[in-house]
Amino acid sequence: YRFDLSVPFDVSTCSYAQRTTDLDSPTYQNGSQALDHATHEDNHPQGVSISNDGKKLFILMESNTHDRILEYKLSTPYDLTTMSLVLSAGINLGSHVANPMGMEFSENGKRIFIADHHGSHKEVTQISLGGEFDTSTFTVDGEVNMKTLSDLDQLRPIAFNKSGLKMYLGNDWTDSGDDMVHEFDLVCPFNIIEGKCPPITDNKDRTAMVEAQIEIAKRTIDHSTDTALNRLKWIRRNKDKQNLTN
């Protein structure tokens, strides 16, 4: 379903716009790299993400035997009536997840994060893509199991702030306890796996900060060097004088 908001980010102003038709049909489910959906299986859409330009839509599908991420093309941005399955893309999640509940992309579209819970496992899986919002090539970086956190029961949605240095997980308690949103601080943006921190050049804000720091350092060095050189020149000019304290 698509809803339009007359005031940005204000759900009280939303109105129904459109929806997909027969998302369970082979046209929208079969033929991609993510493998086909068996007709006798459950097939639950558990997460939806859209590329920054509105030209791609991704759906996280959970089923009995294999969970998938399907990639769709929107020939008109954000228009669900123009949606078509991208056959050369898609991810078969295989054994990496067992009960995926939520999905989120990094700001630049080069990583996907999946919240998953099954039994005592409460995991977030990180996947790196070969291109921005392109699931045709990918690498599963790994997962973080949060079973030691007693406040977590069933992970649901996942989100990040714009800088990617904070991660948010929605938690659903089945029988008792309060449903919560948990906040986590990350060492580097959009990364939860050791050794997989993205390069600074992947983030224009971080790049700008580093460039500014380098420029400040260069100016400081230039100023210090100029001061020292000017002092030496003065000493040379006045080397025959007895008093050089000035």
List each model region and its residues:
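Short loop/turn segments immediately following beta-strands, especially the blade-tip
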Residues: 4-14, 73-82, 128-136, 185-193
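Surface-exposed loop and turn segments in beta-propeller and other repeat-based domains
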Residues: 15-40, 86-96, 139-151
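Residue-level marker for isolated small/hydroxyl-bearing positions within beta-strands
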Residues: 60-62, 115, 170
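Signature of short aromatic-glycine-proline-rich micro-motifs recurring in repeat-based ectodomains
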Residues: 35-49, 97-103, 152-159
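Residue-level detector of Asp-centered blade-edge/turn motifs that repeat once per structural unit
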Residues: 52-53, 107-108, 162-163
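Short glycine/acidic-enriched loop and turn motifs that connect beta-strands
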Residues: 63-66, 118-121, 173-178
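Blade-level signature of beta-propeller repeat domains, shared across WD40, Kelch, NHL, RCC1
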Residues: 161, 165-193
